[in-house]
């Protein structure tokens, strides 16, 4: 019971350690403080194991106090050491290096960090072999000798960290990810579970006085973290079996013939297995998977979400395609055309779907009109379906303004809305009866009005371009050409028009 309670305590305190490090004192100070508490726990454990303490009847209280202190120290160390290690590597995303053999290789940041943590995990499991020595010392010399070795070894490591603390790269405390996640979840709960409402860009549009301590990319990371949590469904089964190493396996071994081997050695089955598998995975399995085009890099690789991505996109493509044909049929009805007149021009379709990511950027260039995420343009194709996040920034031409290139922002009403924009081919077919929608992507409207915003958040969108086949004519249809309305466009194929527009955009003659 004491052992199970101690394990539970050691998995509760990391939550507190993360909050203290991220919001108050930083990782290095948290690790140093937690290490000092951990060391106090080890010293208390050693003192409580002495014969004098046993004679005074304080061994059990001393044990409980030491476990309490060790648990606190574990919380501050376990949750911050891995993050601190990741912060130490500041190399570029990719760099080139010449080996001694003369071979030029590319150093990938993600793979480098993966190798760092593989090595770190390897050393952890090498350290896990200490019970081999500790159990022998405990059997030959008693608990006090075994506990003293732990305290001495930890003291050496603590001194090294303390002396070199100024050498570590550590992010300054800002706001707790845990608190921010809880706040974001609460906002999502109030909006039927939709995390898009927790984006600062959406909150700013709704209430300019409200300030959130995270950016839009935090919500994206939170979504990925939730997806990765699928694996935790299996954890109760795993831990139910794993905890037997520390309880039943040891008790069972104590009732068996050990031939001089301490029964406590059962806990080393786990690190032995890890030490065998880690080099195999790192040097053989993972490189083989990367050569086969199956990279194993990020935490979301432990979930089974990515294999479903391609079928999801294919299904989305088919749904968008059907939707576009329905919209074109409605346009036929609205223009009084014969059923199928426009839809037959859309076949065969050569549509495409794009996933667009606009990275975070500084706001000042947008304010000065020197930069836009997408300059004013019309789309190739017939119509465009746009699905965007809550960041905003899309603007369309205001034709009622009476002056050219006057734009108005497209306000988001629902996170699930679809925006339909008319494109060049439809304008050419209808001989300017339906004009292509001129649009641009710039700073969100709320950011323009706020002087306290220095950075524009990342923006993501999915765009479906409904396009006719490359050999389809995009000249004006006879139904739209009259004596009063002569053909405004030359008859040409969709491919020829795309080539013409490309030459115009790039200033190429001919």
Swiss-Prot record:
Transmembrane segments: 1-21, 31-51, 57-77, 116-136, 143-163, 231-251, 269-289
Binding positions for 2-oxoglutarate per the UniProt entry: 459
GO annotations of cellular component type: membrane
Keyword Calcium among UniProt keywords: no
Induction of its expression: Expression is down-regulated by ralstonins, lipopeptides produced by the plant pathogenic bacteria Ralstonia solanacearum. Expression is positively regulated by the imizoquins cluster-specific transcription regulator imqK.
Locations listed in the record: Membrane
Coiled coil: none
InterPro entries, sorted: IPNS-like_FE2OG_OXY, IPNS-like_sf, MFS_trans_sf, Oxoglu/Fe-dep_dioxygenase_dom, POT_fam, PTR2_symporter_CS
Superkingdom per UniProt: Eukaryota
SUPFAM superfamilies noted in UniProt: Clavaminate synthase-like, MFS general substrate transporter
Binding site for Fe cation: 377, 379, 439
Fe2OG dioxygenase domain mapped to chain residues: 348-468
GO biological process assignments: oligopeptide transport
Record's bilayer topology term: Multi-pass membrane protein
Pfam families listed in its UniProt record: 2OG-FeII_Oxy, PTR2
First-listed, main subcellular location of the protein, grouped into a coarse class: membrane
GO molecular function: dioxygenase activity; metal ion binding; transmembrane transporter activity
Glycan attachment positions: 80, 421
Keywords noted in UniProt: Dioxygenase, Glycoprotein, Iron, Membrane, Metal-binding, Oxidoreductase, Transmembrane, Transmembrane helix
Gene3D superfamilies named among the record's database cross-references: B-lactam Antibiotic, Isopenicillin N Synthase, Chain, MFS general substrate transporter like domains
Family that this chain belongs to: Belongs to the major facilitator superfamily. Proton-dependent oligopeptide transporter (POT/PTR) (TC 2.A.17) family.
Described function: Peptide transporter; part of the gene cluster that mediates the biosynthesis of imizoquins A to D, tripeptide-derived alkaloids that serve a protective role against oxidative stress that are essential for normal germination.
Protein name (database record): Peptide transporter imqJ
Species name: Aspergillus flavus (strain ATCC 200026 / FGSC A1120 / IAM 13836 / NRRL 3357 / JCM 12722 / SRRC 167)
